[in-house]
């Protein structure tokens, strides 16, 4: 005896135009929500970044009690909040309680073991050296790579790291490099952390690259920073 045929579900043909309109609506709504979320969170992100940099600046520039931000664009330095401020490298000048320039802080970044490492470091024009670093962002291996932020022996590298310019003033006299742990012999070398050579090399690379690029221009404009605190 033959089995009765199973009932067939009717196929509903959705017009292509209606489907495209629906997809366009969903895509448009998604894009709007992304933009809205960005606009709502951007001020908070920028404020958190400002606070992090300010805290880091007062750590890496001993004696600094106030700061002013500038934009360095080739041969010119202008206050960052000025209408004439050009695009370029943002620098942070720290001043002591006598309104004297105590040091200059710069941001630097390089690829680490896990992700990009971002730091703030201070340059002291008096000794032409790097006086300290503070990690702003990293995702290095806990207990290994993250030692760059807290290992006392590693941080000693930056008590007076040589950043003098060469005779022409166009670059560093000696490139800042990372060397094997325990083999440091020169003031421009960074004694790496044993077991965290990639993170150590990333710090050396970012300090060297940023200093090579910025310091030749910055040192020619120091007078503008010395006089800014009294304005």
Q: What are the roles of these predicted feature ranges?
A:
Residues 2-231:
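Flexible, solvent-exposed loop/hinge segments and secondary-structure transition points
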């Amino acid at each position: 005896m033959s089995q009765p045929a199973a009932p067939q579900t009717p196929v509903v043909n959705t017009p292509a135009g209606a489907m495209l309109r629906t997809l366009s609506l969903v895509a448009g709504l998604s894009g709007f929500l992304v933009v809205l979320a960005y606009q709502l969170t951007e001020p908070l992100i920028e404020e958190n970044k400002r606070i992090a940099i300010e805290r880091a600046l007062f750590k890496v520039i001993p004696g600094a009690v106030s700061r002013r931000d500038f934009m360095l664009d080739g041969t010119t330095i202008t206050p960052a909040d000025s209408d004439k401020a050009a695009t370029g490298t943002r620098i942070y000048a720290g001043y002591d309680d006598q309104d004297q320039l105590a040091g200059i802080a710069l941001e630097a970044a390089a690829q680490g073991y896990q992700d990009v490492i971002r730091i703030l470091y201070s340059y002291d024009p008096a000794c032409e050296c790097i006086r300290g670093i503070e990690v702003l962002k990293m995702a290095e291996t806990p207990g290994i790579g993250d030692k760059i932020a807290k290992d006392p022996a590693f941080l000693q590298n930056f008590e007076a790291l040589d950043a003098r310019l060469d005779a022409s003033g166009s670059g560093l006299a000696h490139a800042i490099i990372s060397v094997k742990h325990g083999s440091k012999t020169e003031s421009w070398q960074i004694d790496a952390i044993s077991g965290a050579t990639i993170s150590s090399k990333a710090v050396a690379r970012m300090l060297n690259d940023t200093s090579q690029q910025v310091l030749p221009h910055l040192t020619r404009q120091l007078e503008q920073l010395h006089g800014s605190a009294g304005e």
